[in-house]
């Protein structure tokens, strides 16, 4: 049915799969199947799992997860209260930043957020009941102090980064601030924290002083008579 498949050579290259035909064939010659390995604001799911509305988390324990720069030199951080941001809003801010990143040498933009909550809506003046509404768009819950974007480049100046993030902030709801590697970590609306001031805790040293039942069981499981009965 497909005689040309026996004469086809497959060669995998970086960034995609290239199909090469030994005989002159206009359809298969130099045909490339593009593969996308980039960040996506709208996941391409065939079946969208509906979510509850939920609330934006309020961090009260001083957590700094996602609030520090991990890849670039400069970043954009949420300063106001936690908000919900849609995928379309993040994409508009992304486009505004990329206008300044593309001319840079080895310029790169890191996107720290992933829109993982499906928003479903129902029409206006709709009666109660009869199930949840249909899928409309993707969104993400962003708590206070969260890093949204990071940029870096060989010839990136701080003024250029500030202007890029300023324009990106106008596309997004909420109030944002410019951060660098020397900036303190925001853990609340009016509180900051320096991660270097936190003492480094060792799990084994702390449990050795006052061992718990769980820690004693871990030590006992390392004895040879118990290793014989593993994987049964």
From Swiss-Prot:
<dbReference type="InterPro" id="IPR047873">
    <property type="entry name" value="Ribosomal_uL16"/>
</dbReference>
<dbReference type="Pfam" id="PF00252">
    <property type="entry name" value="Ribosomal_L16"/>
</dbReference>
<keyword id="KW-0687">Ribonucleoprotein</keyword>
<dbReference type="GO" id="GO:0003735">
    <property type="term" value="F:structural constituent of ribosome"/>
</dbReference>
<dbReference type="GO" id="GO:0032543">
    <property type="term" value="P:mitochondrial translation"/>
</dbReference>
<comment type="function">
    <text>Component of the mitochondrial ribosome (mitoribosome), a dedicated translation machinery responsible for the synthesis of mitochondrial genome-encoded proteins, including at least some of the essential transmembrane subunits of the mitochondrial respiratory chain. The mitoribosomes are attached to the mitochondrial inner membrane and translation products are cotranslationally integrated into the membrane.</text>
</comment>
<keyword id="KW-0689">Ribosomal protein</keyword>
<dbReference type="InterPro" id="IPR000114">
    <property type="entry name" value="Ribosomal_uL16_bact-type"/>
</dbReference>
<dbReference type="InterPro" id="IPR020798">
    <property type="entry name" value="Ribosomal_uL16_CS"/>
</dbReference>
<protein>
    <recommendedName>
        <fullName>Large ribosomal subunit protein uL16m</fullName>
    </recommendedName>
</protein>
<dbReference type="GO" id="GO:0005743">
    <property type="term" value="C:mitochondrial inner membrane"/>
</dbReference>
<comment type="subunit">
    <text>Component of the mitochondrial large ribosomal subunit (mt-LSU). Mature yeast 74S mitochondrial ribosomes consist of a small (37S) and a large (54S) subunit. The 37S small subunit contains a 15S ribosomal RNA (15S mt-rRNA) and 34 different proteins. The 54S large subunit contains a 21S rRNA (21S mt-rRNA) and 46 different proteins.</text>
</comment>
<dbReference type="GO" id="GO:0019843">
    <property type="term" value="F:rRNA binding"/>
</dbReference>
<dbReference type="GO" id="GO:0005739">
    <property type="term" value="C:mitochondrion"/>
</dbReference>
<dbReference type="GO" id="GO:0005762">
    <property type="term" value="C:mitochondrial large ribosomal subunit"/>
</dbReference>
<keyword id="KW-0496">Mitochondrion</keyword>
<comment type="similarity">
    <text>Belongs to the universal ribosomal protein uL16 family.</text>
</comment>
<dbReference type="InterPro" id="IPR016180">
    <property type="entry name" value="Ribosomal_uL16_dom"/>
</dbReference>
<dbReference type="InterPro" id="IPR036920">
    <property type="entry name" value="Ribosomal_uL16_sf"/>
</dbReference>
<keyword id="KW-0809">Transit peptide</keyword>
<feature type="transit peptide" description="Mitochondrion">
    <location>
        <begin position="1"/>
        <end position="41"/>
    </location>
</feature>
């Amino acid at each position: 049915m497909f005689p040309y498949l026996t004469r086809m050579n497959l060669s995998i290259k970086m960034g995609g799969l290239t199909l090469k035909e030994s005989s002159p064939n206009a359809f298969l010659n130099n045909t490339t199947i593009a593969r996308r390995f980039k960040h996506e604001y709208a996941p391409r799911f065939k079946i969208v799992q509906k979510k509850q509305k939920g609330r934006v988390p309020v961090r009260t324990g001083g957590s700094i997860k996602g609030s520090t720069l991990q890849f670039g030199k400069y970043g954009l951080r949420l300063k106001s209260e936690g908000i919900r941001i849609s995928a379309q809003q993040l994409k508009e801010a992304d486009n505004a930043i990329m206008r300044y990143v593309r001319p840079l040498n080895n310029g790169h933009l890191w996107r720290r957020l992933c829109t993982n909550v499906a928003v479903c809506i129902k029409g206006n003046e709709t009666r109660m009941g009869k199930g949840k509404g249909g899928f409309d768009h993707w969104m993400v819950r962003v708590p206070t102090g969260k890093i949204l974007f990071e940029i870096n480049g060989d010839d990136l100046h701080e003024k250029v980064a500030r202007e890029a993030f300023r324009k990106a902030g106008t596309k997004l709801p909420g109030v944002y601030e410019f951060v660098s590697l020397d900036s303190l970590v925001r853990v609340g609306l009016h509180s900051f924290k320096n991660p270097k001031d936190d003492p480094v805790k060792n799990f084994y040293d702390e449990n050795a002083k006052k061992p718990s039942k769980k820690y004693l069981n871990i030590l006992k499981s390392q004895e040879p008579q118990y290793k014989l009965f593993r994987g049964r």
